[in-house]
Amino acid sequence: MAEKTHRTMDDFAQACGVSRPTLSKYFDDPASVKPATRARIEAALRSSDYQPNLFARNLNRKRTRNIGIVVPTITDPFYAEMVSRIEFRCRDEGYWPIVISSHGSPKLEAESVRTLLSLKVAGAIIAPLGLASDRGVFDKLGQDIPIVYFDTYIEGDTPFVGNDNRQSVSTIVDYLCRSGEPPVYLDIPHVNHNSGERQESYIVAMETAGFKPVVIEGTRDYTWDFERIGYEQTEKMLQAGALPGRTILCANDRLAFGVMAAAFSRGLKVGRRPDCDLRVAAHDDHPLSRYTCPALTTMAQDFTAMAGRSVEILLALLDEADPPKQGLARTVKLGATLVMRQSA
């Protein structure tokens, strides 16, 4: 038997024998209507091709059941992993995520924020570009909807969930100093606060351990092309015979990928065994780090906790029936775990 066709919600409500507000209430939360009414609507759905336009319905509300997620890039598996975890958590709580990438561009990031406002999202979880972000755009967003930053932040009082760089960097510096030659530090462009915090934490950790910190300055150009920077910087040092140490601690895993590729191209053996030429370690536990050759020793950020706490804080801010208490955490810094693999 052919399915019945209903073009509008009014048509379908009439076919179900319920009012339009009751039908709308069902689509918001099936458990909110009487069991008999729910059964009638669901029976009608099975015999009809009707699909509610949830997007249009949401736009007619002051606040939707959509959560905006903005990240610098979706091609980086670190952010892809975070988006995936945040997405599933939002779905579990009855919200639909809308994911937008700023592609490393401050202009596109500002455009992404304006798009979220036009879509009337209930709130947003954002990994901003950081130092290049337009603070005014985010201040405007924060006045209109609740937002939470993760991984990095823009100065202000917006809640933030991220890594405790002091703890994580000191942990891996301690390990490298105990297991071999103290590390030199390969820096990245300071695109956000993580870059500066990690460099500063390295210096403090080395001085605390009684060693002289050695920072290899990278390019000061604004770029997120970290693999290329790692490769070119290492190639340049190897070509000049100016590598300042045999243990390199990279500011993040993507930088280390470039370092290891440059070492391989020069015939150098990376690893922690006595016959190896170079040890390489890094930070983040990027999803591909376990698959490099050799597998990369790194500090693993807590993806699950970062995603979970970000959503929890946003939901608390969205809870009109039970507004968040004054004690709601504004800054959550999560510890990282040392993952010892074969590279160092």
Residue spans for each PLM region:
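Short, Asp-centered acidic motifs that coordinate Mg2+ and/or phosphate
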Residues: A122-I125, T247
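N-terminal helix-turn-helix DNA-binding module of bacterial transcription factors
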Residues: M1-R65
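Flexible loop/turn connectors
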Residues: S179, A240-T247, D253-A344
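Hinge/beta->alpha junction and helix N-cap segments in small-molecule ligand-binding domains
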Residues: P72-E81, V99-L108, V161-T171, L186-E235, ...
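Short, well-structured alpha-helical segments in soluble
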Residues: K107-K120, R228-P244
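Flexible loop/hinge segments that line or gate small-molecule binding clefts
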Residues: G104, A127-T171, E181, V191, ...
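Amphipathic helical "hinge" segments at domain boundaries
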Residues: P35, Y50-A122
